[in-house]
Amino acid sequence: MLSMLKRDFWYDLPKELIAQEPACPRDAARLMVLNQKDDSIQHRIFRDLPEYLEPGDLLVVNNSKVLPARIVGVKQPTGAVCELLLLRQVKGDQWECLAKPGKRMQPGTKVSFGDGSLTAIVDETLEDGNKFVTFYYDTETLYEKLDEFGKMPLPPYITKQLDDQSQYQTVYAKELGSAAAPTAGLHFTPELMDTIRAKGVNITEVTLHVGLGTFRPVQEDEITDHKMHSEWYSVSEETAKLIHDTKAAGHRVIAVGTTSCRTLEAVAAKYGEIRACSGNTDIFLYPGVKFNCIDGLITNFHLPESTLIMLVSALYGYEKTMAAYKVGVQERYRFFSFGDAMFIRGGNGTEGKK
């Protein structure tokens, strides 16, 4: 494979094309359909998706639920305002957090939130500046307190506050643990999912808890030097069997979102098949890497030079992906987390080597 540089994945995007709020209704977002067989592009609405699905196809969605993990509190006893962003559970009520202002939150610092029924003590400062923090509360679970006091950790390019926190959750989200939404799934409504199932298309779930590393820019010039962040995933027996049966019958496995895609490809690369398992993955999919599971991908339009546009290029082909993004800008598609979607139809990743 020819070496590729980060700048190869740059494209110019007018700021006004960065979506600040989701489409309403969700399935009114636009859908760019990219056809592997003839390289044609079609411009549709997301609710038209069932027209491009066939009986026996399998959609794989990520059921991870976003934590309202950004909480603002005051340091005790000074009353200075500070902020914690919960990144991952370490053990019990101890979490790794991003703290602001980090330098003023040394081990032993106590913080109270809201009416004081949620407090936290900083245990340790890590090499990267993150903190280990233990939480104390008067409810059965910490999640109840986060629902009460927390805010959704929106990406930095979204500057508008949400009218409703559920706008940043998929309709099928149930496994709490993500620091960001698996955004391709935001376009689905219960009615659209019913329509898809009525066509004979199966829908199954995996879990991958999206970390804030998904927003971390690639620093290295040579993309192969980039080290991916690690994220926890889980695949059930039911999902593994459905994927096996779908493949055996000659039908397509279509990942809804890059997180579902990375989960399936990580498991397939590790075991040579999809099996029930859980663990952590730092899989990096870029042009030249072979796909071993998925036959199609539903995804949003991603940031320039991000690992996600590299993933799309790996599946659809670098030149074709960058051309499609150029068309997206020309046609005034809405970009990033609350933006429009694309559906890469057909192909099992072999085209991505071009």
Language-model segment annotations:
Residues 2-354:
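Surface-exposed, charge/polar-rich loops and edge strands
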